[in-house]
Amino acid sequence: MFLYPSMTNVSLDLMEFVETQILPRYNAFDKAHNLAHVNGVISRSLTLAKKLGADGNMAYAIAAYHDLGLEGPRAIHHLTSGKIVQSDARLKRWFSAEQIRVIKEAVEDHRASASHAPRSIYGKIVAEADRDLDPESVFRRTIQFGLNHYPEKDQEGHWQRFLEHMQQKYSSHGYIKLWITNSPNAEKLQAIRSLIDAPEELRKVFDRLYAEETA
């Protein structure tokens, strides 16, 4: 059984259900959204839930279900994840109808490009936890996604796609939003932005990680 910090707030039977029935589905996804990714989101969600006094079972379930919609089209995966929550009657063992509604909405609200603030503290927790903003992890994930989805591109093509994605999502005018004040992600996002503003340095990082991922 995978142990996270702050696990004391999660029911053991819920944990067993998630680890045997839900998490294995992430093995079918790309490297940027695999089992390691969802485990990281769970760990960060539980830490934030404890800090904010939120329910551990709720935060755990939301994190576990948040990307299941990647079994369908990526562009609407957050909405598909919400439908998966709503249709999974097994959740009634641990949660009331109202709690399941909140779980569904939080899963729908987790996406970085969402134009509105998450509707509950749980949506803010999973949205924040989904942002693993360690700079090297962000850069590596972006390269991995490009290699997986655009295998026809050469290194220069991947660099141009990488740079465009950095500008659109992570730059000072990018669409990423942080919903929890003074979270650990704020400092990490600033480090990413500093590198975006220094393209020659960013290219060195890209070339190193690209070489590692294509070795």
Regions found by a protein language model. Give the residues of each.
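Divalent metal-dependent phosphate-bond-processing catalytic cores, especially two-metal-ion Mg2+/Mn2+ enzymes
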Residues: 2, 6-9, 27-52, 65, ...
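Hydrophobic, well-structured mid-protein blocks that either form specific transmembrane helices
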Residues: 83-119
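An active-site-proximal "capping" alpha-helix that borders the catalytic cofactor pocket
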Residues: 41, 45, 76-91
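Small/polar-rich, solvent-exposed N-terminal microdomains that initiate assembly or binding
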Residues: 19-28
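Short, well-structured alpha-helical segments
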Residues: 35, 39-42, 60, 97-108
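His-Asp-centered metal-binding catalytic motifs of divalent-metal-dependent phosphohydrolases/nucleases
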Residues: 55-73, 77, 81, 102-111
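Short helix-loop boundary/capping segments at the starts of domains
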Residues: 47-54, 70, 74, 90-91
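An amphipathic alpha-helix signature
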Residues: 11-19, 42, 58, 82-86, ...
